[in-house]
């Protein structure tokens, strides 16, 4: 698989002002256990508590004005729902989030907080 670092740079420029720069940490115990240098990206510290915000923000930032004027729709029972709602709020775009009846109550409440 080839990575196009230009595309990664373009994506980063689109989202950098809308996301939290989360820390990258290492752990000596894990490193010794695996005999490797391992890093953890603490996306649980992201605005919505997960990495999903990066993708949702990038997608919403990439939409045409026609699509933006119509708003966005997402179906999710959790982190993606929160990410789309938050990203739409940040860009002042209408978002309709559909969640299953059995979605965790905390996820429903957190998503509603974003409008």
Residue ranges: model-predicted function:
Residues 1-115:
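PLP-dependent amino-acid enzyme catalytic core
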């Amino acid at each position: 698989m080839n990575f196009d670092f230009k595309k990664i740079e373009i994506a980063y420029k689109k989202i950098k002002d809308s996301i939290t720069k989360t820390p990258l940490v290492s752990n000596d115990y894990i490193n010794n256990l695996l005999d490797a240098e391992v890093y953890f990206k603490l996306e649980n510290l992201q605005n919505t508590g997960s990495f999903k915000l990066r993708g949702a923000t990038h997608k919403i930032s990439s939409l045409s004005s026609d699509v933006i004027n119509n708003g966005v729709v997402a179906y999710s029972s959790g982190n993606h729902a929160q990410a789309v709602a938050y990203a739409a709020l940040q860009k002042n775009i209408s978002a309709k989030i559909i969640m299953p009846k059995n979605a965790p109550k905390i996820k429903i409440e957190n998503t509603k907080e974003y409008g």
